[in-house]
């Protein structure tokens, strides 16, 4: 059974539009979790393809300063994975949600319960950056009969054989990491990045999205030329925190309506 996230993003790709997925940190709002659906609605109204929802954690190894600080602000409001899932169960969203979490909160929650409770939300994808592919069976047996896709991350340093291993049988989309390091770094792209992304996109039979360091309209244009779309995190998180909702809406609208 093809999962909803795969079909949804593939339909956008087939329509010759760029896929645009913004990242937000759950609980990083003046109203805490009570503001979560306000942010989701703002992004939905701007035409996003899906929304990545970050789970705050005390040791976010893949996060740069902006997202790490957002997580700290959320944790200071006593936001937990349990509270986030309960909030997401309150109503369905217009677009699929993708949870980005580290493995520890999932382990503490209970893997089977985690997947079961997520099934009662609009979450259709799951990203766990500190879960190596070799240990994916930690959670895949529970996801197999669900409509939640485990999204693989492919970095610049991933060898060809391992790339194929990660891509073959993957669901949802391929998360192509544009920089070596944490989120939020901008501009320090390798010379062979475009070729790397083009090769990934040509090989994969599901959409390939470029993330980490994507922050400008020029980035959106560049990466839509060599992949199927982009994920934007740090810029969105920073601008929302700074109260720049109109600027966020304009940027997201540009990315979400980008014609190939």
Curated annotation (Swiss-Prot):
EC number: 4.2.1.20
Classification via CDD domains: Tryptophan_synthase_alpha
Catalytic activity: (1S,2R)-1-C-(indol-3-yl)glycerol 3-phosphate + L-serine = D-glyceraldehyde 3-phosphate + L-tryptophan + H2O
InterPro entries the record matches: Aldolase_TIM, RibuloseP-bd_barrel, Trp_synthase_alpha_AS, Trp_synthase_suA
GO MF annotation, one: tryptophan synthase activity
EC top class, as a word: lyase
Pfam families documented for this protein: Trp_syntA
A single Gene Ontology CC term: cytosol
Residue numbers annotated as active site: 52, 63
Lineage top rank: taxon: Bacteria
Nuclease is among the record's keywords: no
Biological pathway: Amino-acid biosynthesis; L-tryptophan biosynthesis; L-tryptophan from chorismate: step 5/5
Keywords: Amino-acid biosynthesis, Aromatic amino acid biosynthesis, Lyase, Tryptophan biosynthesis
Keyword Coiled coil: no
Subunit structure comment from the entry: Tetramer of two alpha and two beta chains.
Family: Belongs to the TrpA family.
Function of the protein: The alpha subunit is responsible for the aldol cleavage of indoleglycerol phosphate to indole and glyceraldehyde 3-phosphate.
Name under which the protein is recorded: Tryptophan synthase alpha chain
Organism: Streptococcus thermophilus (strain ATCC BAA-491 / LMD-9)
């Amino acid at each position: 059974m093809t999962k909803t996230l795969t079909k949804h993003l593939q339909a956008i790709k087939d329509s010759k539009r760029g896929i645009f997925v913004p990242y937000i940190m759950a609980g990083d709002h003046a109203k805490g979790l009570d503001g979560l659906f306000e942010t989701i609605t703002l992004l939905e109204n701007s035409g996003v393809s899906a929304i990545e929802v970050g789970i705050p954690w005390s040791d976010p190894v893949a996060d740069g300063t902006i997202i790490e600080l957002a997580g700290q602000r959320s944790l200071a409001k006593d936001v937990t994975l349990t509270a986030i899932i309960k909030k997401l169960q309150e109503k369905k969203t217009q677009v699929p949600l993708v949870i980005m979490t580290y493995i520890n909160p999932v382990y503490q929650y209970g893997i089977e319960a985690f997947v079961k409770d997520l099934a009662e939300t609009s979450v259709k994808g799951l990203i766990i950056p500190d879960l190596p592919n070799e240990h994916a069976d930690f959670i895949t047996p529970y996801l197999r009969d669900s409509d939640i896709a485990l999204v693989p991350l492919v970095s610049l340093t991933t060898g060809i054989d391992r790339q194929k291993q990660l891509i073959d049988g993957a669901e949802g989309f391929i998360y192509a990491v544009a920089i070596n390091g944490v989120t939020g770094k901008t501009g320090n792209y390798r010379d062979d990045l475009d070729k790397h992304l083009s090769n990934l996109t040509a090989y994969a039979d599901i959409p390939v999205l470029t993330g980490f360091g994507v922050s400008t309209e020029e980035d959106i244009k560049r990466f839509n030329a060599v992949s199927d779309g982009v994920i934007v995190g740090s810029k969105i998180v920073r601008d929302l925190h700074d109260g720049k909702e109109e600027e966020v809406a304009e940027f997201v609208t540009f990315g979400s309506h980008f014609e190939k």
